[in-house]
């Protein structure tokens, strides 16, 4: 499937999506540009699908796309993904996130969007 390069090379694009995906799991909603939100939506749906399987292999696959940092004293990003979010979408077959268009950014009028878990 085609994807947006987001005006970056491969390593920069992977780092950007990794950071955005980690922030989305921690905050459950972020504001970013529309093109970044659309790319992040593809990755987020894949991460939830991996988390629903819940095996060690899928945990390691998901860890490749996330920073496993602490959210609070007892929870990390991977734990939140595999425990809270996976159980929340256990009966859903897809469409775990939604992209809502908002007003353009003030400085350069870039199209902005809110991406959140549905």
UniProtKB/Swiss-Prot annotation:
<keyword id="KW-0689">Ribosomal protein</keyword>
<comment type="similarity">
    <text>Belongs to the bacterial ribosomal protein bL17 family.</text>
</comment>
<protein>
    <recommendedName>
        <fullName>Large ribosomal subunit protein bL17</fullName>
    </recommendedName>
</protein>
<dbReference type="GO" id="GO:0003735">
    <property type="term" value="F:structural constituent of ribosome"/>
</dbReference>
<dbReference type="InterPro" id="IPR047859">
    <property type="entry name" value="Ribosomal_bL17_CS"/>
</dbReference>
<dbReference type="GO" id="GO:0015934">
    <property type="term" value="C:large ribosomal subunit"/>
</dbReference>
<keyword id="KW-0687">Ribonucleoprotein</keyword>
<dbReference type="InterPro" id="IPR036373">
    <property type="entry name" value="Ribosomal_bL17_sf"/>
</dbReference>
<dbReference type="InterPro" id="IPR000456">
    <property type="entry name" value="Ribosomal_bL17"/>
</dbReference>
<dbReference type="GO" id="GO:0006412">
    <property type="term" value="P:translation"/>
</dbReference>
<dbReference type="Pfam" id="PF01196">
    <property type="entry name" value="Ribosomal_L17"/>
</dbReference>
<comment type="subunit">
    <text>Part of the 50S ribosomal subunit. Contacts protein L32.</text>
</comment>
